[in-house]
Amino acid sequence: MDASDWDERYAGADLVWSAGPNVWVRELCSPLTPGRALDVAAGEGRNAIWLVEQGWTVTAADFSPVAVSRIRDLAATRLDEDALRRLEAVVADATQPAPGTAYDLVLFSYLHLVREEWHRAVAAGVEAVAVGGRVLVVGHAQGNLTEGVGGPQDAAILLDPEDVLASVAGLPVAVELAQLRARDVEGEPRPALDTVVLLRRTEDAPAR
């Protein structure tokens, strides 16, 4: 789907995604000391707004202008004036250099791209994070197609933990966590299967 497709999807519903943060984002980001965060392909901003509520200063980026407008609208209903100053919503392509650098956290939550585009996106994310900062990748796993629920139905854009690790091979990161996890989905008889990978930037060198 291109930006216009997502514009149409976001324009046609009150909320495409839930208003609360992803369960894995909440679990893994809650222990982190708030700093500067970049939410890549932020959608309607559910994770970005939650991060702001936890004390982070967040850039929420999406290539859909309608999604970016949704982020601003949702933030206005959830955040006070001081918190709103810590949220910037921008139109940006995940496969291009990130909007800004030296982030303490770069988040990829259910960003599914063909492999070449994914490699560009994750390399840009690693380059944008400060030494000691984290890159968190959450997405639908390959097994979700046959054993899970929801998510894209195209195996070419789904990532298992080992696929994420292969995509960052040679980049200056250390692996803190790489797991396949089951996520309960309300109203569904079986869980969704998610890939969850947490990386830490290890050296001050450009991503390659």
Task: List each language-model region with its residue ranges.
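Class I SAM-dependent methyltransferase SAM/SAH-binding core
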Residues: 38, 44-95
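Short alpha-helix
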Residues: 156-176
